[in-house]
Amino acid sequence: MDKKSARIRRAARARHMMRENGVTRLVIHRTPRHIYAQVIAPNGSEVLAAASTVEKAISEQVKYTGNKDAAAVVGKLVAERALAKGIKDVAFDRSGFKYHGRVQSLADAAREAGLQF
């Protein structure tokens, strides 16, 4: 099993548990250059709020889009958008990535902005 398939397997196991519990989830995806965050409805069919470093407003705020500072900006923005729609409790779906670095920075910023997970 290679590194990518192991990550996908971890992510599938976590998502299965979240679907069974029927909770709204904050899903992240990480690439070397960008980070994406989405708040997804419990049934998984609807994206309720989203933010990423691809957005022009965020990429203009930060010097480089693939670091912890950019992840913190994305975390704060996705939390603000979710709170504006009345969502404050979510489950954090890290998509099999380690809770370290950019993933941790995004999660901490979302918590500071008011999301509960």
From Swiss-Prot:
**Record-linked SUPFAM superfamilies:** Translational machinery components
One annotated Gene Ontology cellular component of this protein:
cytosolic large ribosomal subunit
Task: Kindly indicate whether the keyword Protease belongs to this entry.
Answer: no
Q: Taxonomically, which superkingdom?
A: Bacteria
Q: Which UniProt keywords apply?
A: Ribonucleoprotein, Ribosomal protein, RNA-binding, rRNA-binding
Task: Select a single GO molecular function from the record's annotations and give it.
Answer: 5S rRNA binding
Any one biological process term the GO annotation gives: translation
Entries under InterPro entries matching the protein:
Ribosomal_uL18_bac-type, Ribosomal_uL18_bac/euk
Q: Which PANTHER family match?
A: 39S RIBOSOMAL PROTEIN L18, MITOCHONDRIAL, LARGE RIBOSOMAL SUBUNIT PROTEIN UL18M
Which NCBIfam families would you find in this protein's record? L18_bact (TIGR00060)
User: Main role?
Assistant: This is one of the proteins that bind and probably mediate the attachment of the 5S RNA into the large ribosomal subunit, where it forms part of the central protuberance.
Complexes and interactors: Part of the 50S ribosomal subunit; part of the 5S rRNA/L5/L18/L25 subcomplex. Contacts the 5S and 23S rRNAs.
Q: Which family does it belong to?
A: Belongs to the universal ribosomal protein uL18 family.
| Name of the protein described by the UniProt record | Large ribosomal subunit protein uL18
Q: Which organism is it from?
A: Mannheimia succiniciproducens (strain KCTC 0769BP / MBEL55E)
